[in-house]
Amino acid sequence: MFSTKQVVLSSLLFISSIYTSNVNGKNLSVFGAFFGSPNDNDNAREHCCSPRNKFHLTSFSSGCDLQKEVECLRAECKKSKECCNVVSLCSGLSECEYVEKTCDAIKQYYQKQAINTDVKITLVLKWIYKCMNTTSRAKLAVFTAHAIFNTSAFACLEAEGTWKYRSRGLLAIQGEKNYGLLTSYSRNRENFKECPHRLADLNCDVISVTVDWWYRNVGKCCKDYFGSLEILKPTEWTALKKNCADRESARRLENRRRLYEILVRCYE
């Protein structure tokens, strides 16, 4: 006769064998797809994406020999021409999701009905997604909220005035020091210090160097939206910190926060 302990142990081993399969010589657990394991790495946990199922993947590729299917979140595999053999569930956004959901957020905030047909906005969002090089909903939401609010949905990229180093670009970057940093980050050796007006150009190279500036000066120091305000110091935030905010500053600060919250809801 088997003891109760032996019966329980045998049952657990049996269940484990059902929910675990071998892929490319590596044991892969369905539960591990949800929760991960200490042996996981970022590449191993990349999201599967079937070319036949652009938005949802309800069945795995032939290389994913699993006994039970797990509903995948929408995301694109980094290997564009093949589905990864390791199944995982990520909470990130694919490029398609990011663009679609961000356009929805812009439409909600600005109350524009035809925002999804705006080719310019779609193209800029694709550039932002590629340059950000992350699928993190949280990171994308913070950066995108500031970029959209600062530029009125990419329509205004330069502040009024005559100061050479006035606010420009997606993040309303200003000051001679910051323009010098942008120059040092530029992969194309663009001299933003000598030609600061270039920061108001809306192209992939400018977005790339702007994202570099973000990661080096904001992203590494803050963990959330309010932390980013402390570093970016938009005029309305600075006025609030100095206890000299007027009604307009308060309104702008509230609108900036509201846009961020709309993005967060759309990304859920």
From Swiss-Prot:
Span(s) of short sequence motif HBM: 77-82
A GO term from the CC aspect: spore wall
Keyword Signal: yes
Keywords: Glycoprotein, Signal, Sporulation
Glycosylation sites: N27, N133, N150
Localization, UniProt: Spore wall
Location, primary (coarse class): other
Cleavable signal peptide: 1-25
Keyword Magnesium: no
An example Gene Ontology biological process: sporulation resulting in formation of a cellular spore
Entry remark concerning the domains of this protein: Heparin-binding motifs (HBMs) are characterized by an XBBXBX or XBBBXXBX sequence, where X is any neutral amino acid and B is a positively charged basic amino acid, and are defined as the consensus sequence necessary for protein-heparin interactions.
Record's protein name: Spore wall protein 25
Native source organism of the sequence: Nosema bombycis (strain CQ1 / CVCC 102059)
